[in-house]
Amino acid sequence: MSGDGDKAPKEARLAYLATLYPALSHSFVQREVEALRARDLEIHTFALHATDPAHVLTEADREAESSTFTVLPPRLRGFVGAHLRALLTGPAAYLRTLTFALSRPPGGSHGRLWQLFYFLEAVPIWRECEKRGLTHVHAHFTNPSGDVAQLVARLGVERGGAGRWSWSFSAHGTDIFNDGPASLAAKVGSASLVICISDFGRSQLMRMAPEEHWEKVRVAHCGLDGEWFENGAVPRAEGDLRLLAVGRLEREKGQSILLEAISLLQQRGVPAVLEVVGDGSRLDPLRRQARALGISDRVTFTGPVGQDQIRDHYRAADVFCLPSLGEGIPVVLMEALASGLPAVASNTMGIPELIEDGVTGLLVSPGRPGDLAAAIERLAGDRSLGRRLGRAGRRKVIEEFDLDQGAERLRSAFLQVLSGQAAR
């Protein structure tokens, strides 16, 4: 935390925009917001969509939800009123921003339709920012919140706010590849600041963007607070190997690969059970797959778990499995390592920045259930290896993925942008 002599200036106010806030699978955004607030930054949270009430699980979630401005579902009077105010008080700016939105996307009419939706969402956020005196919008993820944040700032600039309105975004994992290279390069050029959570992500943005914009692309790891480094897991020396997977149940997370690996382990007589924590569109297909593989008695689908309880699940496990097909540096992997668990993870994108194979965990080729099963079997046959990996992984997270370190980097970067605005 910043000392009294290092207080942020009164201009250190900004909007934080995410698709959902709070979000069960993106609890790291909540941690980041609270860490920045503790460092004298005034953060106002905005979300494109309301959070599913079933995913508001803790008191912190409820507080975050109640204080967040949400666009959808729209409050009709406020939604229409924002557009009428923007159109009637600045028709040229409104139409120029709409034209900008419709002229830039790839994907033909389908892409333009999405940009129209983003424009419709951006105007109420601009109006709320105007009411609150906010002129900088930071988006988590390049799309869709990145598109909307860009349009919010664009509308502010078109209305005469050049030099005052600006925007920035954080790029994480697969979101880097959801935009076309030209679209993402344009976002990097338009933004005042770009935060990447991994060196891999930064390298990909540098590959797409012109060199004159590289300086604004910085790395600030997501991180964990000190509570995560207390009372770690104690892997057992015998009995069924208790495997844990945590995350959204979506195709890119690779849970189907993990189920195939469990089937292979069962065929080889390796005693292992799996708990899957999380929710998503693949829940029912994964349950059907488990039944078809004959491993339903070895797999438990727990559903969503709040941050106030998730640590109990890490502490009850012996090995953490992350079979993703693409990731930045997953926070669930940090949580597992901070809990002292040995991890088996896919060797893809930013993951090797956290997992050094054979040192802080085991890396396997993504999409290959045989490789995943072999790594798990190795840990089942050598529990002492798991304990060594768990200790080393825990040290890695403590030393390099501490929330305070990342928050200080973000604070410094935001203050540079905001002080530049104030000087104009």
In which residue ranges do the predicted regions lie?
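Carbohydrate-associated surface elements
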Residues: 200, 223
